A protein has these predicted regions:
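Domain-scale recognition of functional cores that engage charged ligands
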Residues: 3-203
Length: 203
C-alpha cells in the first residue's frame, strides 16, 4: 500500500515486464494525465501540483508527476491548496517568488479537508475555476461511501458495482447487529472504519 500509488502504477509494470515476457504493461498514469492536459493547455504553461505539503509521501507523488510533466515541456509548481487564489475563475499562485497565473491544476488533497483551511482561504474556487483541473471536486459524489444509497433514484444500472459491492445501508436507518462494517462517508487508509466484533470496549 502506497500513497496514491501513481508512480508505482506507472513505473513498476515496466520494470517487471522483462521477467514476465508473456505479459505487456498497460497504461501509464503520468502519461495519461499529461495527454489530458496537452489537449486543454498550451505548451510550457505552469501546472500546480496541489497537495498537503506537510506530508513527505504526498510530495513524493506530486514530485513524480511534476518531473514527468517537466520532461515533456511543462513547468511545475508544488503548492498547498491555500497557495492558490482565483481571479475571474482562473487560478493564480501566491507563493513568494512563484506568483502569477497557473495553467492547470492537479489536486492530490482530500476534498473534505478544504473547509478546515484558514477562513481566509477561498477554497470554493476549486469548484468553479476555468483553469483545467485533474480530480475536479465534482468527483466527490462518486467518492462517497453513501453513493450506493441513491443509485436507484439516479436510475443507474451499474451492473458491475451491484454485483461486486456488498449491501450498503445508512447507519441512521437502524441497528444492524454483527456482520456489518461501519465506514465514514469520506475517508482513506482505513481510518474511522469500525467492525463491531473487532472493537474493544474502550473503542
Amino acid at each position: 500500500d502506497v500513497p496514491g500509488g501513481l508512480a508505482e502504477a506507472s513505473v513498476l509494470p515496466r520494470i517487471a515486464q522483462p521477467y514476465f515476457p508473456q505479459y505487456e504493461p498497460q497504461g501509464h498514469v503520468a502519461r495519461s494525465l499529461l495527454e489530458a492536459f496537452q489537449k486543454r493547455t498550451g505548451p510550457g504553461v505552469r501546472i500546480a501540483f496541489v497537495h498537503a505539503t506537510s506530508y513527505a509521501d504526498d510530495r513524493q507523488v506530486m514530485q513524480f508527476l511534476g518531473d514527468y510533466f517537466e520532461e515533456n515541456g511543462y513547468r511545475s509548481l508544488y503548492a498547498a491548496p491555500d497557495h492558490l487564489i482565483w481571479r475571474e475563475q482562473q487560478a493564480v499562485s501566491l507563493i513568494q517568488g512563484e506568483e502569477g497565473s497557473v495553467g492547470g491544476i492537479v489536486r492530490f488533497y482530500p476534498l473534505e479537508w478544504l473547509p478546515n483551511l484558514s477562513g481566509r482561504t477561498d477554497w470554493g474556487g476549486y469548484y468553479d475555476t476555468q483553469t483545467p483541473s485533474c480530480n475536479h471536486p465534482i468527483a466527490v459524489f462518486a467518492q462517497s461511501k453513501r453513493l450506493p444509497l441513491i443509485w436507484d433514484e439516479l436510475g443507474l444500472e451499474l451492473p458491475a458495482w451491484r454485483a461486486l459491492l456488498p449491501e450498503t445501508r445508512a447507519p441512521e436507518a437502524g441497528k444492524f447487529g454483527d456482520g456489518w462494517i461501519y465506514k465514514p462517508a469520506l475517508g482513506r487508509v482505513g481510518e474511522g472504519i469500525s467492525i463491531r466484533e473487532a472493537l474493544t470496549p474502550k473503542e
